[in-house]
Regions:
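Active-site loop-to-helix "anion-binding N-cap" substructures in soluble metabolic enzymes
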Residues: 1-200
Length: 200
């Protein structure tokens, strides 16, 4: 039986109190599930949500929505990997389309975060996906391949097992277009083949 990974990115939603309530409800719903579950609340709710999950004896993983590319220093507004570790975070989402499109994060910049997270023992959920322009131009595979190659540069066979690839059909977000299961499966297949090519 295939094991699924259910990841919840809460984005800029929930106060700590709301996060505790939501996490508790999720923990009750997935108790005893064979599937892997992760929740990524806002930074301000990580501590409270993590404590709530631990108090319930839940095996839900605590994730962060982002992290700094630097370990320490004068980086106003950033959150370091060490800070995340201290809160019990085991997973970090990197390369999300909103980080790429709104904040201008490049493959090279994301790669720096990926390598740092893996070095510190965190699991990485790496988001990839083609834009509407790339899809309309017939460059779906090239767009996704460029992201995979750029974001995974320098990641070795010994750590690639700690990377989960998440496909985001960016072209279907806010465009009125819909990504069908067939659309997603075609890209999933390509991603599996590309990772196999890169890592054998």
């Amino acid at each position: 039986m295939r094991t699924y990974y259910l990841a919840g990115n809460w984005k800029m939603n929930t106060t700590p109190a709301e996060g505790v309530e939501l996490a508790g409800g999720i923990a009750d719903q997935v108790k005893g599930s064979e599937h892997r579950v992760m929740v990524a609340p806002p930074f301000t709710s990580l501590s409270a949500v993590g404590e709530a999950l631990r108090s319930k004896g839940s095996n839900i993983r605590l994730g962060a929505q982002n992290m700094s590319s630097e370990e320490t220093g004068a980086h106003t507004g950033e959150v370091s990997v060490r800070m995340l570790e201290s809160l019990g975070v085991g997973t970090v989402i990197l390369g999300h389309s909103e980080r790429r499109l709104i904040y201008g994060e490049t493959n090279e910049f994301i790669n720096k975060k990926v390598q740092l997270a893996l070095t510190k023992g965190l699991e990485v959920i790496l988001c990839v996906g083609e834009t509407l322009e790339e899809r309309d131009a017939g460059n779906v595979e090239k767009g996704v391949a460029d992201q995979l190659e750029g974001c995974l540069s320098g990641v070795g066979k010994d750590t690639i097992g700690s990377v989960v690839i998440a496909y985001e059909p960016v072209w279907a977000i806010g465009t009125g277009k819909t990504a069908t299961p067939e659309d997603a499966e075609a890209v999933h297949k390509f991603i599996r083949e590309k990772v196999e090519t890169l890592y054998g």
